Regions:
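Post-DEXD/H (motif II) to motif III coupling segment of the RecA-like Helicase ATP-binding lobe
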Residues: 70, 235-236, 241-307
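Conserved helicase ATPase core of P-loop NTP-dependent helicases/translocases
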Residues: 176, 188-200, 216, 353-355, ...
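Walker A/P-loop
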Residues: 120, 134-159
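Conserved pre-motif I regulatory segment
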Residues: 48-55, 82, 86-141
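Conserved interdomain hinge at the start of the Helicase C-terminal
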Residues: 155-156, 318-357, 361-368
C-alpha cells in the first residue's frame, strides 16, 4: 500500500508530501466546485479559467476542514497516511457550559425593549453559545433578530483568558451596534473602521473591508500599522453575517493572516446555497453545527409574525421591456403620490419602514410624507443611528431606506 505524510501547518492549512500526481489530481477534482455564472466572466470566455473554484492545490496543499473528503479519496486510491506532523501551537481550550444568568446583575441599556432589566440570555442563545464552546471552530445558522450581538459579546467575554478577540461584521452600522452591547457589558472594546481606529483593546470590532484595505496598504507600505501588528495576540475570531463577506477576501484573511487563531466562530442568517461559497467558509471557519430558524423564533414569540397585505394597483400602460416598466414604477408621479398618501395613512398605526431601490423614488416619497427620514448611501453613520433610535423610542415615525 502506498503511503504519504500529512503536515498540519496551522489551524487551517495542511500539506501532503509523497503523494503521486494522479492521486493529487483526484483530490483536487473532488474539491473543485462550479461557479454558476462563470460563463459570463471574461477569464472563462477567453479560456483562461475552467469556471471552477478549487480548494486543493496540485502541489499538495489544502485545508484541515476538508480532511474528510481528502481521506475518502486516499482510501479509494489505496493510500495511507503513514506520518502526521502537527505544527500547531498547543492550546488547552477548556470551556464550561453557561446558563442564562451569565451576565449577573448587568442590565439592558436605555432604548432596549427590556430597558433596566437584568440581562438574561434566552434559552436558544444559551444553546447557540454552548454549541460553540463545545466546538471551537464552527459555524451556526442563526436567524436575524435572534440577538447575535449579545451572543458575540458573551463569547468574547468567555475567551478573554486566551487572548484578544476580533469580531468581523459586514458594515459600519453593525460595528457601532455591536460596540454598544460590548460597552454595556463592561468589556474592554475598540473599533477599527473609517476614521475610528482604536488600538490596544482586548476586543476589536471591525468590518472585513477595513481589514482588506489595511492588508493592501501594508503590502505597499502605505500604512504606519501593518495588518500583522494589528492582529497580534488575536486568539478568537468571530465573524458575524458570514454570508455577506466576499468569499475570497474572507477566506484569504482567515486562512493566511489569521491562520494561527485557534478559536474561530461564524454566525449567519443564511448559509450560502452555492457550494463554492459554502466551502470557502467551511475551509476558513469550520462545519455547520446548529440552526435557529426565523420560524422557531416566531413560535417562541421573539420575532413578530408576518401579515402580508398586497395592495393591487391598476397599471394600464404596456411596456416593451423590464427597464421601461421599472422606470414607470418608480417615477410615475400619480403612482408615487398614491404611495405617499397610503404611507401617511399607514403611519397612524405605528412606525413605518419603506424600502426603495431608487434614490429618486425615495426623495419623492420623503417630500410627500411629513417628518419622514430618508436613509441612503451618503447619510452619515451618526444620522442613521439617530433615525434608528427614533424608531426605537417613538411611534408614528417613517423611515425610507434604500436596499
Amino acid at each position: 500500500m502506498a503511503s504519504c505524510k500529512l503536515i498540519i501547518e496551522d489551524e487551517v492549512n495542511i500539506k501532503f508530501e509523497g503523494l503521486a500526481v494522479d492521486v493529487r489530481r483526484k483530490i483536487s477534482n473532488a474539491l473543485k466546485f462550479e461557479v454558476p455564472y462563470a460563463r459570463y466572466m471574461p477569464q472563462y470566455k477567453l479560456g483562461r479559467w475552467d469556471g471552477k473554484v478549487g480548494f486543493f492545490g496540485l502541489g499538495g496543499s489544502g485545508y484541515v476542514n476538508h480532511l474528510d473528503t481528502i481521506t475518502d479519496v486516499l482510501h479509494k486510491q489505496g493510500v495511507e497516511i503513514s506520518e502526521i506532523i502537527d505544527r500547531r501551537e498547543v492550546v488547552d481550550l477548556n470551556f464550561e457550559d453557561i446558563k442564562e444568568d451569565f451576565w449577573g446583575d448587568k442590565t439592558w441599556p436605555k432604548g432596549h425593549p427590556a430597558e433596566g432589566e437584568k440581562i438574561r440570555l434566552r434559552d436558544y442563545q444559551v444553546e447557540v453559545i454552548n454549541n460553540f464552546l463545545q466546538n471551537p471552530q464552527a459555524l451556526q445558522e442563526v436567524a436575524t433578530g435572534a440577538g447575535k450581538t449579545i451572543i458575540t459579546a458573551t463569547l468574547s467575554k468567555i475567551t478573554e483568558h486566551y487572548g484578544r478577540s476580533l469580531v468581523i461584521v459586514p458594515n459600519k452600522s453593525l460595528v457601532t451596534q455591536t460596540e454598544d452591547d460590548y460597552i454595556n457589558c463592561g468589556l474592554d472594546v475598540g473599533v477599527y473602521f473609517g476614521d475610528r481606529k482604536e488600538l490596544g483593546k482586548t476586543h476589536t470590532i471591525c468590518t472585513w473591508q477595513s481589514l482588506n484595505i489595511l492588508d493592501k496598504r501594508s503590502k505597499y507600505g502605505e500604512d504606519v500599522l501593518s495588518l500583522a501588528e494589528f492582529l497580534e495576540g488575536v486568539s478568537t475570531v468571530i465573524v458575524d453575517e458570514v454570508h455577506q463577506a466576499k468569499a475570497e477576501v474572507l477566506k484569504n484573511l482567515l486562512t493566511r493572516n489569521l491562520k494561527n487563531a485557534p478559536i474561530r466562530w461564524g454566525l449567519t442568517g443564511t448559509i450560502p446555497k452555492e457550494k463554492f461559497e459554502f466551502e470557502a467558509i467551511h475551509a476558513s471557519i469550520g462545519p455547520v453545527i446548529g440552526q435557529i430558524s426565523a420560524k422557531e423564533l416566531q413560535d417562541k414569540g421573539v420575532l413578530s409574525e408576518c401579515h402580508v397585505n398586497i395592495v393591487q394597483l391598476i397599471d394600464t400602460p404596456v411596456h416593451s421591456n423590464y427597464q421601461e416598466e421599472l422606470k414607470y414604477l418608480v417615477s410615475n408621479d400619480q403612482r408615487v403620490d398614491y404611495l405617499g398618501k397610503l404611507a401617511n395613512k399607514i403611519k397612524q398605526s405605528g412606525n413605518t419602514l419603506i424600502l426603495v431601490d431608487r434614490i429618486s423614488a425615495g426623495e419623492k416619497l420623503q417630500a410627500l410624507i411629513p417628518d419622514s427620514v430618508f436613509v441612503k448611501g451618503d447619510v452619515k453613520l451618526k444620522d442613521r443611528k439617530e433615525a434608528y433610535d427614533e424608531i426605537n423610542e417613538g411611534t408614528n415615525h417613517v423611515v425610507i431606506a434604500t436596499y
